Amino acid sequence: MTAVNLLDFDLDALAAYCEQLGEKRFRAVQLFRWIHQRGAADFGQMSDLAKSLRSKLADVACIAPLRVLSEHRSSDGTIKWLFDVGDGNAVETVYIPEDDRATLCISSQAGCAVGCRFCSTGHQGFSRNLSTAEILAQLWYAEHSLRRERAEGVSVGARAATGPASERIISNVVMMGMGEPLQNYAAVLPALRVMLDDHGYGLSRRRVTVSTSGVVPMIDRLAADLPVALAVSLHACDDALRDVLVPLNRKYPLAELLGACQAYLASAPRDFITFEYCMLDGVNDSDEQARALLKLVGDKGPVGRLPCKFNLIPFNPFPESGLKRSGNERVQAFAQVLIDGGLVTTVRKTRGDDIDAACGQLAGEVQDRTRVQERMTRSPIRVIRSAAQPDAA
């Protein structure tokens, strides 16, 4: 019998599972805390659970972390982990400490079916959805391995001296890694519940962000089920260009997407939508296109004035993309047009340049290596550099 991975369960599902084992709900709360707040992967560590329950769980369940293929640390504090998810697939997770926050960027799929022109992951194609356990295992590993480092005197977390963010190893989670989260909704929703649960990671809805390329029906669904902060990969000011850069636009054009964003604000934890905009030299970075964006989200746009902010993202070049990063002066000029038009606009700082380039590139290299190995030797993925699994904090 295959052991049940308890990382797959939100608290309600874990309570139902405990009831199947003849246990009361409060046991699920204890177990949940041991897993997510204390990082325990061994039932024997759970000292406030009855020995009979620990023995029962050891027979039928497990807490199975992902195998770490490699860990890359940047001089700016950024950490990128590459996790093995089986069948020649790997996913990336990135930890980004800043002065006022410490953000974990996690993946929701192995590969991606959307196929955005500027995205390394999209060029790899889609392999499969991650399970809830595989999504949460990224957060679980990062939280508890870094917590152990802090206990050993290593400086991790937000660099701020005071405030709630400085007390947390991870203060923010963004689903902006590999994959389209809203095309894996069945696994993403329970993972979000665990992130927000006070018995889990206790993050506020404002500090958890789902980024989507524009799956309109699922934006509506998320608004009804669990509205967290929403970011939308926009990247173009009109349908003609967005059809090319973000092929999903052919199914859900801008007017529909902006309508869903407007409706989302009624229940969102923030009073604005974040639009992500990858700056591509000579493609979408002219002043004229910036002015078109102002019209798109302004009073005369398809849904009227849409409260939003823009995050301009420097393009990370990767082989065969055929695209170039906009120059710094062009990015600043583009941003100034938006700012002068009354939009809050930021330019994302590039982080971890000395450890990797585009999101998905490490995973793509693993895919390529694995395909060669399968043809030549039929051997499993080669471990680049193993990292120890975290102990309970």
Curated annotation (Swiss-Prot):
Cofactor: [4Fe-4S] cluster
Residue positions binding [4Fe-4S] cluster: C112, C116, C119
Domain Radical SAM core: 98-354
BP GO annotations: rRNA base methylation; tRNA methylation
Alphabetical list of PROSITE patterns matching this protein: RADICAL_SAM (PS51918)
Keyword flag 4Fe-4S: yes
Cofactor binding, note field: Binds 1 [4Fe-4S] cluster. The cluster is coordinated with 3 cysteines and an exchangeable S-adenosyl-L-methionine.
GO MF term list: 4 iron, 4 sulfur cluster binding; metal ion binding; rRNA (adenine(2503)-C2-)-methyltransferase activity; rRNA binding; tRNA (adenine(37)-C2)-methyltransferase activity; tRNA binding
EC code(s) of this entry: 2.1.1.192
Gene3D superfamilies for the chain: 1.10.150.530, Aldolase class I (3.20.20.70)
Disulfide bonds: C105-C359
Known catalytic reactions: adenosine(2503) in 23S rRNA + 2 reduced [2Fe-2S]-[ferredoxin] + 2 S-adenosyl-L-methionine = 2-methyladenosine(2503) in 23S rRNA + 5'-deoxyadenosine + L-methionine + 2 oxidized [2Fe-2S]-[ferredoxin] + S-adenosyl-L-homocysteine; adenosine(37) in tRNA + 2 reduced [2Fe-2S]-[ferredoxin] + 2 S-adenosyl-L-methionine = 2-methyladenosine(37) in tRNA + 5'-deoxyadenosine + L-methionine + 2 oxidized [2Fe-2S]-[ferredoxin] + S-adenosyl-L-homocysteine
Catalytic residues (positions): E92 (proton acceptor), C359 (s-methylcysteine intermediate)
Single GO cellular component term: cytoplasm
Protein's job: Specifically methylates position 2 of adenine 2503 in 23S rRNA and position 2 of adenine 37 in tRNAs. m2A2503 modification seems to play a crucial role in the proofreading step occurring at the peptidyl transferase center and thus would serve to optimize ribosomal fidelity.
Remaining remarks: Reaction proceeds by a ping-pong mechanism involving intermediate methylation of a conserved cysteine residue.
Name of protein: Dual-specificity RNA methyltransferase RlmN
Provenance organism: Leptothrix cholodnii (strain ATCC 51168 / LMG 8142 / SP-6) (Leptothrix discophora (strain SP-6))
